[in-house]
Amino acid sequence: MTTKIKFTKMHGAGNDYIYVDTTRYPIAAPEKKAIEWSKFHTGIGSDGLILIGSSDKADFSMRIFNADGSEAMMCGNGSRCVGKYVYEYGLTAKKEITLDTRSGIKVLKLHVEGGKVTAVTVDMGSPLETEAVDFGDQFPFQSTRVSMGNPHLVTFVEDITQINLPEIGPQLENYHLFPDRTNVEFAQIVGKDTIRMRVWERGSGITQACGTGACATAVAAVLHGLAGRKCDIIMDGGTVTIEWEEATGHILMTGPATKVFDGEMEG
């Protein structure tokens, strides 16, 4: 008998994933399922697969698999959607929950109106590492490497529309300085504490948004004196607000979480 697996497709600022409650629907070989289901013509279509599970360290756990089957350390947009999922599907009544991820325990604050989660604030912790990167003659810009539990390469440019992201994104993702590959962000200051950003995600390619990438971009902007400690990051799929708390050193990310549809696939 064929097993049916129920899923929910959700997105955070356009960064869309397939969500499965593995306490009800265990998934074998999630790497393969992520590849199969993420295909737009023959699968569901998404940036990847996120598994929600139990944890002995937190209220819930989250595992993230990119569209190419690789497992990610963290997904900021995905964590917001997990918060919406567990609240609206009755897995918790709490409006502040903890989430066990490969990059540590994250604290989520749910903004609820009329029984629905309208936004989620995620305490992303402190940036783990920052470093200037100079490519010499190979690329005509300087970048900043920022780790938010996963690696990011942030580059500020005068005109983001002039960046050929499909061409340069994979070159930088796989550049020899980054043996584990890297996420790639290009950003432009468009107003006071307002930044336009586009992303090439490691393992997924161009996506509509990247939460950890938005955090990394805000960190780089502060370090270079381009923005204050609280700013809006405008991405292709939507906007998130990032605050780098001076007192704690933590990054707070606030943004939307949206359900697209429910469905079921063969296991």
UniProtKB/Swiss-Prot annotation:
Keywords: Amino-acid biosynthesis, Cytoplasm, Isomerase, Lysine biosynthesis. Signal peptide: none annotated. Coiled coil: none annotated. The record marks 152, 201 as: Could be important to modulate the pK values of the two catalytic cysteine residues. Its main location: cytoplasm. It catalyses: (2S,6S)-2,6-diaminopimelate = meso-2,6-diaminopimelate. It comes from the Bacteria. It is an enzyme of class 5 (isomerase). GO terms for molecular function: diaminopimelate epimerase activity. Pathway: Amino-acid biosynthesis; L-lysine biosynthesis via DAP pathway; DL-2,6-diaminopimelate from LL-2,6-diaminopimelate: step 1/1. The keyword Cytoplasm applies. NCBIfam families: DapF. Homodimer. Belongs to the diaminopimelate epimerase family. Catalyzes the stereoinversion of LL-2,6-diaminopimelate (L,L-DAP) to meso-diaminopimelate (meso-DAP), a precursor of L-lysine and an essential component of the bacterial peptidoglycan. This is Diaminopimelate epimerase. It comes from Bacteroides thetaiotaomicron (strain ATCC 29148 / DSM 2079 / JCM 5827 / CCUG 10774 / NCTC 10582 / VPI-5482 / E50).
